[in-house]
Curated annotation (Swiss-Prot):
This is Oxygen-dependent choline dehydrogenase. Its EC number is 1.1.99.1, 1.2.1.8. FAD binds at residues 4-33. InterPro entries: BetA, FAD/NAD-bd_sf, GMC_OxRdtase, GMC_OxRdtase_N, GMC_OxRtase_C. Involved in the biosynthesis of the osmoprotectant glycine betaine. Catalyzes the oxidation of choline to betaine aldehyde and betaine aldehyde to glycine betaine at the same rate. One of its GO terms (cellular component) is membrane.
Amino acid sequence: MEYDYIIIGAGSAGNVLAARLTEDADVTVLLLEAGGPDYRLDFRTQMPAALAFPLQGKRYNWAYETDPEPHMNNRRMECGRGKGLGGSSLINGMCYIRGNAMDFDHWASLSGLEDWSYLDCLPYFRKAETRDIGPNDFHGGEGPVNVTTPKIGNNPLFHAMVAAGVQAGYPRTDDLNGYQQEGFGPMDRTVTPKGRRASTARGYLDQARPRNNLTIITHALTDRILFEGKRATGVRYLKGDAGTGQTAYARREVLLCGGAIASPQILQRSGIGPAELLQRLDIPLVQALPGVGENLQDHLEMYLQYSCKQPVSLYPALLWFNQPKIGIEWLFNGTGVGASNQFEAGGFIRSRDAFTWPNIQYHFLPVAINYNGSNAVKEHGFQAHVGSMRSPSRGRIQVKSKDPRQHPSILFNYMSSEQDWHEFRDAIRITREIIAQPALDPYRGREISPGANVQNDDELDAFIREHAETAYHPSCSCKMGDDKMAVVDGQGRVHGVQGLRVVDASIMPQIITGNLNATTIMIAEKIADRIRGCQPLAKSNAAYFIAGDTPARTSPVRHSLPVTSYP
């Protein structure tokens, strides 16, 4: 089999490339996906409120685990990644967050990445999006990804939590992806107007499937990329449960879109990576690139949970006897509790004036439960998910063998920087001050977690070590740039070889301030134009907020304990 392009991974980026490249009728594309189809009748992936279900099994989830994390009581921590058409957009929380404008301006300040500024990227965010309330300078109206905004009449806890954030002295913003990300406000979600998950399989692949120049093969586990000298020429993959070896060849390029965990694995198995690692595993060296699998970053988060004095939370939706009615309303009408991911409010703040853009993110949830559906509190409750955004901690990914079925060694090295501890202590104390504001007086009951007895630094640190969890945002493990640890250039081309690009969240040089899916899609849209030889979209001239000397907060309505200063 021979094609112009072979795309490895039908996830948030791979599906974008498949759809855009096949817009050229004379181009042939093979899309390889290790998982299966995105079954449209499977409520576990299609119902927004069921987002925890795919993380509980291995049908749609690679279910990676980290090595024992040394600063987290040596816990082996979850690292769920999507498996199937749609990749992680098939199992994520559906929060449509792009990151802060300053994230991209920081990227553009790095050598070789000058065209990755926010105003360079904004047109590609708009190109990908159809927002249900229409386009403007920041949002698109004709893109493949449906974005739904919160509606009047949604849960009152969303509004109370945003109001409490403002009463605590932080800004309000009406659009976390608009002029000003900083502040508290409504949160958009990747959900269709009919209440279905808007994965990239639904948005992009549905447009591309009818085209004769696109071939999609599922249950195709990539073994390695093939080379003739320094040029990528094809892909060796294993088909089906039997693992039958197959080979496909690329006339133009191989496009690796496996994500931040799989892409460095595949590169390393293919002979691209740290020379010592490859030599130890007897993998023939094609190109020594020490940065492959390094610079690994993620967002860590905690839940602060409270009982709710009024019966307005989503606790009844967790009871089995209420779920058939919820499911029927969603299935036939696309409405009701089932049609929302229930992350309809949140925010981004600076914990201190020293930060030039937000370093803390909030997701508000009108029920008390773990992200993966475990440990639900058996009463009315609500919670704030809170975590730091740009940790200095860096991890790594290393293959353990040549076997593509064997999971790699993953170490995020969470909380390895003193800054991490300062930020998380601040985050807990700030959250408590937010929850204590008058807007939540009608609802706020006792603190369930961490608990009112957890107060001093040592007590907070012990809670963080034992209870902080991944936000499922691995990234940056094949970073772009031109320094000695960079893996790809600003167009995704792997250094030192020809005919091979990496296009996914792994090429971010630094993790963004927020959820990753929207930015991963943008990256693929932007590089797709480069691959096709198209003129880049015109740079936006939209104005956007820069904090400058603006204080991180004003005086709160109700004071709580002061945040201790950094040493």
